[in-house]
Amino acid sequence: MEALTELCDIIAKNPKQFSEKLAWICGRCPQTEWLLAESPRVSRSHLNAVLAVARIISKNPESIDNRAKSVVNEFLSAIPASFRRSFWPHSFPSQLISSFYCDFLSYLSCAADLSPEFGTEVARFTGEVVIAAIAPSSGDSDGDPAISKAFLVALSQHFPSILQSDGDKLITMLLDQFVLNRAPASPKEQRQQNSANSETDTSSSQGSPISTNRYPSGKTEMASPGDEVASHGSNLSSKSSSSVVMNGGSIVWKSGVDQLSFGFSEGSGGANPVFRQQVASFEDESIESLEKQEIAFRLITHILDKVKIDSKLQDQVRFIAKRQLQSMSAFLKSRKRDWNEQGQVLKTRVNAKLSVYQAAAKMKIKSLVSLETDGKTSKRLVLETLALLLDAADACLTSVWRKMKACEELFDSLLSGIAKIAVARGGQPLRVLLIRLKPLVLAVCALPDQGAMLESIFKTSCVIIESAWAKDRAPVDNFIMGLASSIRERNDYEEQVDREKQVPAVQLNVIRLLADLNVAVKKPEVADMILPLFIESLEEGDASTPSFLRLQLLDAVSRIATLGFDKSYRETVVLMTRSYLSKLSSVGSVESKTSAPEATTERVETLPAGFLTIASGLMDTKLRSDYRHRLLSLCSDVGLAAESKSGGSGVDFLGPLLPAVAEICSDFDPTMDVEPSLLKLFRNLWFYIALFGLAPPIVKTPTPPLKSTSNSVNSVGSMSATALQAVGGPYMWDNQWALAVQRIAQGTPPLVVSSVKWLEDELELNALHNPGSRRGNGNEKVASTQRLALSTALGGRVDVAAMNTISGVKATYLLAVAFLEIIRFISNGGILNGESSVSASRSAFSCVFEYLKTPNLTPAVSQCLTAIVHRAFETAVSWLEDRISLTGKDARNRELTTYAHACFLIKSMSQRDEHVRDISVNLLTQLRDKFPQVLWHSSCLDSLLFSVHDNTPSTVVNDPAWTAAVRSLYQKVVREWIIISLSYAPCTSQGLLQDKLCKANTWQRAQTTTDVVSLLSEIKIGTGKNELWSGIRTANIPAVMAAAAAASGANLKVSEAFNLEVLGTGVVSATVKCNHAGEIAGMRRLYNSIGGFQSGSTPSGFGGGLQRLISGAFSQAPQPEDDSFNEMLIARFVRLLQQFVNTAEKGGEVEKSQFRETCSQATALLLSNLGGESKTNVEGFSQLLRLLCWCPAYISTPDAMETGIFIWTWLVSAAPQLVSLVLAELVDAWIWTIDTKRGLFASDVRYSGPAAKLRPHLSPGEPEDPPESDPVDQIVAHRLWLGFLIDRFEVVRHNSAEQLLLLGRMLQRSTDLEWCFTRHPAAAGTFFSLMLLGLKFCSCQTQGNMQKFRSGLQLLEDRIYRTSLGWFAHQPEWYDVNIPNFCHSEALSVSVFVHFLSNELSESSQSDSKGKPRESGNLIDVTDQYHPVWGEMDNYTLGKEKRKQLLLMLCQHEADRLDVWAQPISSKDSPYSRLKISSEKWTEYAKTAFSVDPRIALSVASRFPANASVKSEVTQLVQTNIVDLRTIPEALPYFVTPKNVEENSVLLQQLPHWAACSITQALEFLTPAYKGHPRVMAYVLRVLESYPPERVTFFMPQLVQSLRYDDGRLVEGYLLRATQRSDIFAHILIWHLQGEDVQETPKDGSIDKNAAFQEILPQVRQHIIDGFSPNALDMFTREFDFFDKVTSISGVLFPLPKEERRAGIRRELEKIEMQGDDLYLPTAPNKLVRGIRVDSGIPLQSAAKVPIMITFNVIDRDGDHSDVKPQACIFKVGDDCRQDVLALQVISLLRDIFQAAGLNLYLFPYGVLPTGAERGIIEVVPNTRSRSQMGETTDGGLYEIFQQDYGPVGSTTFETARENFLISSAGYAVASLLLQPKDRHNGNLLFDDVGRLVHIDFGFILETSPGGNMRFESAHFKLSHEMTQLLDPSGVMKSKTWHQFVSLCVKGYLAARRQMDGIISTVQMMLESGLPCFSRGDPIGNLRKRFHPEMSEREAAHFMIHVCTDAYNKWTTAGYDLIQYLQQGIEK
């Protein structure tokens, strides 16, 4: 319901905006037809909805639509139905029904009061509803009286509008049903009624109106109304039989109520039979009847207030009320013993009856409103009513029920009514009332326990006095004087000895009442009447001697003095001061020893309290100043007088005055000019405070032992101990005094009396001592004591011996200074009294430094004063550190205090005295190091940059030396300040600097701007080594530096030599910001001028308006006419930003410059309105701010994020008040990216980079569609964003726990136990930067402001460690991003994390070695428990250390890997490249990793493949916990081994449950080593079947070879099933089966196996064909026939002469017809054949057959079918193509690996397919020519050819071609290294039309080479001289292009090494194929060796560099080209 209530209030504020919400709520209300049903029943939701609508209307009835109002009115009209229980929901309690009625009617009545129109609508239904409640219809038997009563009770509290015509009817019914519906009246009662009616000249419409009480007929006879009041005037002035004794006399007055003919008096009630009958009649009334009467009276009162009723009916109401009031006195005079009922029953009855009387009194008062003011009858009725009310009030005072709350409320109502009548009528009623009121007041004051009655009397008196003061002053004066004179009347107890104790309570209460009246009415005339009487009593009367009366009068006069009336104030202060000094003068006298206790109370409590009361109440500035002077003078007099007294009189008399002094000094500004006389009084006060030890201790350390005192003088010894205790504690006096001293310190000016001669003369200081005092100047031991105390107070900074030249009084004086200046900082951190804002001028250092400025100080004194400054600073730091855990307003005050001190110290650096400047710099440096947040506070930076000019005293401007010294000092400090701030938070620092540049520019002060520019021009920030800072500074984190570049606004991309010039970018960005601010200001002016608004709202000038905007606040609020301008621009910017978001979500590209401009303008608009008070567009600005924070996150591109960081920095720099809002929105947006899986949190597999792209060939898992956009862009955006957040963390970590908690929320959500990060390798740096932020955040647990979150931070730290380890749960990958210096930044990011982690570990080990554990709480030393992060654990502390060590090792390795990737050709070795780790440590690492996550252990083994210890331990762990690893395919090699297969291990039983692995891994299990184990085979086939057949087709040669070992025909079964799923798979398989039909020369032992293999091939082929469906068979027939015909052309051409062969090809091609449009190229199934170019046939040269090249017209199967392209193919007959297929398979895998790693390397694995025995189809590489062909047309080498083809060296086309040649050469270099292709003559090297190299013809690979394997080509790849000319223009391997080539080779080789097993498995499966490449040596073993798995990444990089160097222009390469030229004529 609370949420619904909040929603209602929001809707009520803006019903138009939330009209849909309102309509929805109205729809939840019960509908009209429902309410009109015969027996409606509502639900709880109905009732809540009705209340909600009613509440909304009550808030804003004029703006709510009619639908809502009609809903409420319809429900109101249906309320009669609610009187039935069936109307309400089931089990709906009565309390809730009452609550509903009350809430509903309160909303309804409120709305009706606010809107007369709505009230009229409500009034139409109110009468009928009330009538139904009063008198339910006789036919409604289901009605529940309790419900209707609950409604009437609620109605009596909240009565809505009614119609005029309903008034009489309702009152008549109420009287009939609830008041007059009784037994018939007796004849006597009838006569009484008639008599009353005749007396008032009225006649009742009722039959027989009777008393409001239910009297049985004939039981009670009452006097007629005519007899009750004989004369109203005489009644009001007559005497009462009762009397109140007052000071020996009596005040006698008679109440009219006593004239009622009850016939009893005080004390005789129980014996009088008439009274007993009266009580009996009261008891006869039921409680229900009383409740009904109360309801009726209250309702009638409401009706009388709403409408005008019939006069006769009104008379009847008045009569009924009168009879109630008449009976009230009798009721109140009853005693408990008169009642038969007792206990709770009686209490309930009395409460009910009193409530009836209260309602009747209010009804009586309301009934008088309609009377004519001047009518005779009216006056008589008014007097009569006053008499009745006063009589009733008097009866309340004497009633035994007086203490009951109901009686007190009745008394209050009576007096309120009396006051209301008297004030309204005035004249005689007022005068008569004041006569009667005085005895009533005295009677109340005479009561021993007045309770609330005295408060009621006080309120009534105030109302009457204030209202009658101007109308009729005389009776008011008489009333006041009568009360005041009553306190002077002598009492009757003179004969008693101890008369002071017998002061009547009435006197004390009257005094208090009169004082309260004075304070309340605030009239000097009243004070002048009363105060003289009080003072006279105090000086001459009974109160002149100690007594309770005197104490009360002193309190009263002090309260009167607070009113600030000059005369009364001065008289009072003089009296109290004289009284206080008189007490001091009597100390030690005989009289003081026998004085009354009240005398002590007066001195200790009353007078000090009075002084404090005056100090608190005085408001007039002049009087406060006078009172301050008087109080300080009193303290000085008291101190001097008490100093000569024995004992502790100084403490006793000065101490009680301190709270008053503190209060009167609370508003005194100590920095203003103070008169010397007042300053001396302050000095005297502190002198005595120090002397008497009244100040709180200022030293926390134990006081040193006393050495200089002697036992020979006891008093001196005691005094020395007291002095030392005063310094070191404990405090011996009242704690309130200590607090008062602290407050006094805040308002005390520096105790520097003279600017010329600082220390006062000895005589003047000695005058503070009494000449005869034991503390006189001549007592050297006393002086020694004071010096010792001073030394202690200074913390031992000044030795006692160095103070010998300081006299005793000077030591006391310096001790007073020390107390004062240190206490300033103890109390509130050193903020002085003054203006509300905390600024440098309010820093207490402004006082401390005053002592240092005085010339001619002696060395000893100067040393002491300097020590005081340092002690004050230490105290300030301690105060700030103690409050570091505060939050909210307290934290804000603490920060403002820090900044105020920093600003003052900055400004003090311009002081003329060098000593002061040095101290300022020293303290400022300490403060900055302790509280780094000052670095980024705007006021501190303002002071730094501009104070050197602002604070230059005009008198010394002409001193060049001083000016130069100060400027030099400022420049040094500013430079250091800015460099440090940039090193921690470069974003925020730059934002602030840009802000200050704008500010300096607007000031138009050339010197200021020049100095700032000269300072900034020398400062640069950048990544890498920086001489400005070292260690782990935030600026060393690449993400932060990238964000800093964005924040600078320079739009820079991080480059290798990234170096951000602070000045240049700052000026540019400041100019941009100023321009945007100017645009907004200009638009505003133009808009206002066009709109005809007042010109006064226009800013006075561009510069001034701009300055206000940049500083973040306007000096004056925007005028209302600006609201429409703001609304228009807000709507525009919101619309534009939403459009950008929509564009991004639809996949469109957001235009960078437009987005940046829009965001900047929106930010300028937002900032321009910050200082305004207008709340019109708050929601709009909130929405705009939210969009500015969220848009970059939505768009998620680096450009958008750069813009975001720029504007966020602008916002937080120019508007610190928005920082929390901005950060909260950014954290929400960050969490949104987690929920929506974006960027860094794109945890879906398809965003994981290489792992996803290599599926399923080299990585396990189903292949998925690639992401729509490059995930790296979003990762880079997150990286920039994270840099900004780290920057903000550094700024807020020390001063804002709230913002830290926001970051903590972000980190907690980011480190959920369920992995939510992307696996993309390009995210490594960003990921570890986030983890670094997390660890930095957790290190805050040692900070005071995060102590209470310590346990939570420890858990978060564990989550961060687990998340960090989670990064290593997958195999390491590489990724190359086409962003300058990105890889270097990634490596550096991990290195910084490693650095932080290693430092944390070293700190941990150091603390452990010292026996001081770093952690506390219940999270350490836990054994055998479940940890929320780590799960089951044995020992938390030990396990945590092991996990940290593991993480550090893995991160070191990752940093090394990334460093190699970033700097592949670097010759340096990483410090982590060769970790010296023992085998035991490796084993422990493996165990720890496995305990966290088994995948981490597998990753460790993968990262260190040559480490036997790790492999052995991981193997054991996998096999031991194998059941838990079923989802991890990478674990397969650790239990599916040839050994386990041989032993048929039980571990293999897990394979049916194991997750699918990659295809290459599955292929490995098909090799003979695994012996075709059934479980292994079943797993392999399940894996293959889990992938689409099209994906498996790539490995068709390997699958065909696996048939050799397929004894169980399992592979064959898979192949047949796959052919059913894919026709293309079937066709490719058939072609490969046909290609294997090769007659090999049998070798020993192999003939049987090969024969069996050859035998099965045609069988499988036939089974496939037999399994074809008709359509599939048709497709198969057409496809194969078509290409068989093309292939057969070669046989036709063979007999023909060469010159006729081309024509023959054309003839044969013309014979071939296309059979369908679904034929495809066998080498590229995705290309559909659309025809043959018959004139394209070319016969090729060949020794045996006639290969032909034919060009087809093809289209892309999945592309545009109208886009027909040529594709040439070579059809070979007589050549075995299978070896080319294998080589190109490896090249294809390498290409995929390179692409997955983002490497810019080029390979072209053209298509080759064997279609039969020694037959095949080979795709022609398009747009290429061989190097030999190029040589046939050009004489020069490649370098010259490239210039001819692509233009001169240096041209764009040439360099592009060179780049293409480079990337292709590097790609084939890696492929050549692995495959070892030979016969690399220029005929086998192709170049395409853009300069790329392509290798063809792989007849010699692996271990084979031409010339009988002579291995003449010894280089790993061909890099001839002409190739080096292109790759290395320098010729000495020093050029940039050569380094690029080598770098790409290294990266390609490193990427290939990651997939070594997959490549080797692919080749190994072909081992038995009979291919020539396997004919000699150990091809598989040597292939593995070329990967060098035993090498680290850096070693592998060095190896590849060596390979490149070795191949560089190797002579064997040139020699082979020469041989080929000589033998084959191939151009070299």
Swiss-Prot record:
Start and end residues of each stretch annotated as G-loop: 1740-1746
The UniProt record lists the keyword Cytoplasm: yes
Residue span of region Disordered: 184-241
Span list, region Activation loop: 1895-1920
Compartments reported by the entry: Membrane; Cytoplasm, Perinuclear region
Signal peptide range: none
EC number annotated for this UniProt entry: 2.7.1.67
Polar residues bias spans: 192-215
Region spans: Pleckstrin homology (PH) domain conferring phosphoinositide binding specificity: 1660-1773
Membrane topology per record: Peripheral membrane protein
Occurrences of domain PI3K/PI4K catalytic (ranges): 1734-2012
Domain PIK helical: 1483-1659
Location, primary (coarse class): membrane
GO MF term (any one): lipid kinase activity
GO CC annotation, single: plasmodesma
Oligomer status and interactors: Interacts in vitro with actin filaments via its PH domain.
Function, as annotated: Acts on phosphatidylinositol (PtdIns) in the first committed step in the production of the second messenger inositol-1,4,5,-trisphosphate. Can bind to phosphatidylinositol 4-monophosphate (PI-4-P or PtdIns4P), phosphatidylinositol 4,5-bisphosphate (PI-4,5-P2 or PtdIns4,5P2), and phosphatidic acid (PtdOH), but not to 3-phosphoinositides. May function upstream of the cold response phosphoinositide-dependent phospholipase C (PI-PLC) pathway.
Name of the protein in question: Phosphatidylinositol 4-kinase alpha 1
